[in-house]
Amino acid sequence: MKLRISEQVKEDLIDLWEYIAVHDELAADRYLDSVFERAGELCIHPEIGRPRPEVHTKVRSLLCRNHLIFYRIRTETIEVLRILHGSMDLPNQDYEEE
């Protein structure tokens, strides 16, 4: 399966990198590398994440360190919708693509 990243995820990743990079740019790079690696696992094992009915009936999440990768399984693609810190008010975030 192919991985498709939403525009919102790109913004989430930029925000995440900038937040960590204030203290250590190399650590920010490594953190994002781990997020990309974990997201790549979805191509091989799309069902690995747990269902998130409080977000949407077809949305799942996969834990990566302190963040959650929210995604939806389509016929031939995995749509990554958001990457959010686990302490956020998750049900009240926007998960839909524009």
Question: Where do the language-model regions lie?
Answer:
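Enriched for short, Lys/Arg-rich terminal
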Residues: 67, 72-98
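Basic, Lys/Arg-enriched alpha-helical interface segments
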Residues: 2-59
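Basic/aromatic recognition patch in beta-strand/loop cores that engages polyanionic ligands
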Residues: 47-77
